[in-house]
Amino acid sequence: MRDRIAEAENTLNITIEERLKDLQQAFVASDSTKWERKKEDILKSISCRLLPKKIMDTKEEKNCSDGTKGVLISGVPAKQVKVDEIQYFIDMKIEGMILGVLWIMMIGWQLDKSYTNCYGNRIRKTLYNEFSKEPTFSPALFEPYFQNYESWRDQALTLAQKCMQQDDVLIFTLDFKRYYYSVDVSEEFMKEILTRVKGKSDYNEEYLSRINDFVYCVIKRYSQIYREHSGEERIRRILPIGFLPSGVLANECLKKFDTAILDGWNPLYYGRYVDDILLVEKVEEGSRIAQKAQDGKLEFYEAFEYYTVNNSRWTGKENRNARAVFKKEEDECGTYCILPEFTKPLGSATKIQLQASKIKSVSYTHLRAHETAANL
């Protein structure tokens, strides 16, 4: 975005002020044709920027996996580096980024007010003046990430330590695999957002419709370009990384999942930081996992499935063979995915699954602590 701002400021034939005025006139034009032309011009500018996310381990790093050898990390570039995973970022005209900010100012902040137990990508509470309801024009749209991250982590650990004095405790850490690429943002999903906001917004309904439609069009256009670059065959309307509305929409996509955990399970602590989850729960005395936890023989999958897959202990659930919020995929990896009923009205191609390498369960007894960590 900084590059696009600098580019706009250094354009010789038109000033950035003139570009902003032209955008504003198109957006509020009573003639929708003018707005549609401007929108299409911005959409045509969308492209992908590719950056390495993960580098393959070097031969030396693999050799030291047994812990007997060390690795020297230096600033000297390697002769040959192999990229293991690529991260895709959206790129487009600065006007598109500005409209993304406008969506947050008009729609996103309304959605954000309804989120509970959610710590990442949170919009600043001071975005609008509490009394005048006017924008404060703060230079930052979102809360500082490090403050919310510390709060998310520390609250879980503090509660676990307090509970451990009298009860056995389980802590789960979960992470969704390539979350932004896993959702399928449907037209129905975006329309539902618009309907909810229209009922409590002072903004012109036509403007609300235009800005919401623009964000959806960006998602569709970017997803098409992403498939062309990545070779992805599955058709999904994914969340563009680097597009500001994606941060809010990422929370919106998991809102039903959050509610299901809180209402159905109601653990001692549930907190989500974008796609990372912390759960703290007291081990029920006399339960089938209590003795295993105390003996240090509790396996991850037993604890995880007891609480999140089999829903016999969930509030209002009578079918003991039914599932809670996750299902186990019939594959060799034994992947766990969120059940479709907790992702609707996202599209049918949505498949939000846990990342095996980052899933962990830790059991503590009030007499001693024992950690059980297992990859799926």
Q: Which residues does each predicted region cover?
A:
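Extracellular/surface-associated beta-sandwich interaction domains
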Residues: 298, 352, 357-359, 367
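Conserved two-metal-ion catalytic palm core of "right-hand" nucleic acid polymerases
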Residues: 1-207, 232-233
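Extended alpha-helical scaffolding regions
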Residues: 374-376
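Conserved small/polar residues in nucleotide/adenosyl-binding loops
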Residues: 365-372
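Intrinsically disordered, low-complexity acidic Ser/Thr-rich regulatory segments
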Residues: 78-84, 88-89, 160-164, 233-235, ...
